[in-house]
Amino acid sequence: MTKLTYKKASIAVAVLLISSSFTNAVHAADEHNVVPGLTAVGKPLGLHGIDPVAFINIGNRISGSASFTETYDNVAYYFSSEDNKNAFKKNPSKYVPQNGGFCTFGVSVGKKFDGNPKFAAVKNGKLYVFLNEDIFKLFQKDQDGTIMKASQQWQKIEHVAALSL
């Protein structure tokens, strides 16, 4: 292989590696509600940086720290302690927000809206987030029905870009 051909091949490999990392971030952004941009670990941030373990275990919205980051399904989550990070690592599906972190009420009607952890509920050990206070109040009127509809709709829209819905 000549120097020029080797250099071109090296550049092509580098471009492929870089573009594949962006593809993962875009993939996560379509299936998970994430904050724009990437974290220090190269993945988008989920749950607005709130510690999901603290949320589920003690019902408290504690901001996590980049010092305690764990990645699951191409999304980075911040934790308030090493213990919480380790608990998540052992069983991430117990702690991640349902419906990819999108607004549960929105998902129940086939849409992907921001899920804001300021408006959230833990029901049957699962975390559900909502767009705003008004939507959260609608959810409170029929929690089981909304969750059931969201679960059915999520199967249809999980892999569909939010802007396409």
Could you tell me what each predicted segment is?
Residues 18-26:
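C-terminal segment of classical bacterial N-terminal signal peptides
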Residues 2-12:
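Bacterial N-terminal signal peptides that target proteins for export
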